[in-house]
Amino acid sequence: MKTYLVGGAVRDKYLQLPTQDRDWVVVGAAPQTLLAQGYQQVGKDFPVFLHPRSKEEYALARTERKAGQGYTGFSTYFAPDVTLEQDLLRRDLTINAMAEDDEGQLIDPYGGLQDLQQRQLRHVSEAFVEDPLRVLRVARFAARFAPLGFEVAAPTLALMQQMSQQGELAHLTPERVWLETEKALSGPVPQVYFQVLRDCGALAVLFPEIDRLFGVPAPAQWHPEIDTGIHTLLTLAMASHLSDDVAVRFAALTHDVGKGLTNPNFWPHHHGHGPAGVRLVREMCQRLRTPNPVRDLALLVAEYHDLIHTVERLRPATLLKLLDTIDVWRRPQRLQQMILCSEADARGRTGLEDQPYPQAGYLRAAYHQAAQVAVCNVITDGFQGAAIREELQTRRLQALKSWKAAQEAALNAE
């Protein structure tokens, strides 16, 4: 029995990155061997064991053979005669198919180190096409390692295109698509994930609402990049610069999906894209089974991001209605999330990445004024039942009117 460190831990060592988890492969052993040594079996589909002291995962060397459709349609063979090279052969990318023995010697039968040095994400074998999940995983790795200069190797991208065209992606469950997407949205440059999916044709299959935006023009005076799809990825990139909140990043990604449904006869203008976007975002989130907080923010951003751009011109009553709709009184974090998404939209334009966004400070100040109206004071003044909310709204509106009048007076005095 021999054990080898495999996968991400070996890859990250040669990239000089911190190791998150260490996974091990055991060659020349049967389940009974590990159980006798105190390992705890946790794997259902194939034997995975927890080390009795370190609790790290040890898996018996195995091979996989396609036996059905989708990413779960595999039969697994594990026995003492399975070699390390056979186990590594079933892995997705060469940089993930390296191992180290107990003396720290690299075992690299498929050229992973060379691809790592050349910053290439390359498939290990033609069996890559048997698992549709690998399309998403490669796109995610491309986004994760893009800051280090990694790109998808041309032959691997060609296989991903083939898989997208042949309908294999239809076998991916919504939960798995969202899981991979959520991981990508948590990374430093999630826009690369969606760009790679578009390059291989998977975006049209898995995220048609986003894919449809490419080629849809916007007015050049407002959008120097013109293409709404490009603007969408720029907005996602800016949102990722401003916040690590997955909900903010997803809402930035979907903020303009309604522009894919507007009448081409009126392009490059997109009147009514907000309400159209709300319907699409709702359908998209239902299909992907996104968490409710992610869905709710995306719906609000799709409908109201343009209104926030004009917040300095809004009447006090409209401003209060916006704050009520965002539900800032019960969910104050929503205000900052909405502001970040709108700022990402404004700055996610070619050449305008560094422009200020004064609407952010204005909306925060407006909220601060309205929030100073305390419900306890309304109750102390004798209001009861439904009258409490009515009076609260009246006082908040008056606070906004007074504040806005003072703002305008100060501007006129300059």
Curated annotation (Swiss-Prot):
Cofactor(s) needed: Mg(2+); Ni(2+)
CDD domains noted in UniProt: HDc, NT_ClassII-CCAase
Pfam families per the UniProt record, alphabetical: HD, PolyA_pol, PolyA_pol_RNAbd
InterPro entries: CCA_bact (IPR012006), HD/PDEase_dom (IPR003607), HD_domain (IPR006674), NT_sf (IPR043519), PolA_pol_head_dom (IPR002646), PolyA_RNA-bd (IPR032828), tRNA_CCA-adding_enzyme (IPR050124)
Similarity annotation: Belongs to the tRNA nucleotidyltransferase/poly(A) polymerase family. Bacterial CCA-adding enzyme type 1 subfamily.
This protein's encoding gene: cca
Binding sites annotated in the UniProt record for CTP: G8, R11, R91, R137, R140
Segments passing through the bilayer: none
Protein origin, superkingdom: Bacteria
Function: Catalyzes the addition and repair of the essential 3'-terminal CCA sequence in tRNAs without using a nucleic acid template. Adds these three nucleotides in the order of C, C, and A to the tRNA nucleotide-73, using CTP and ATP as substrates and producing inorganic pyrophosphate. tRNA 3'-terminal CCA addition is required both for tRNA processing and repair. Also involved in tRNA surveillance by mediating tandem CCA addition to generate a CCACCA at the 3' terminus of unstable tRNAs. While stable tRNAs receive only 3'-terminal CCA, unstable tRNAs are marked with CCACCA and rapidly degraded.
Name this polypeptide is given: Multifunctional CCA protein
Reactions listed under catalytic activity: a tRNA precursor + 2 CTP + ATP = a tRNA with a 3' CCA end + 3 diphosphate; a tRNA with a 3' CCA end + 2 CTP + ATP = a tRNA with a 3' CCACCA end + 3 diphosphate
Additional comment: A single active site specifically recognizes both ATP and CTP and is responsible for their addition.
Domain named HD: residues: 228-329
GO annotation terms (biological process): RNA repair; tRNA 3'-terminal CCA addition
PANTHER family documented for this protein: MULTIFUNCTIONAL CCA PROTEIN
Residues engaged in binding Mg(2+): D21, D23
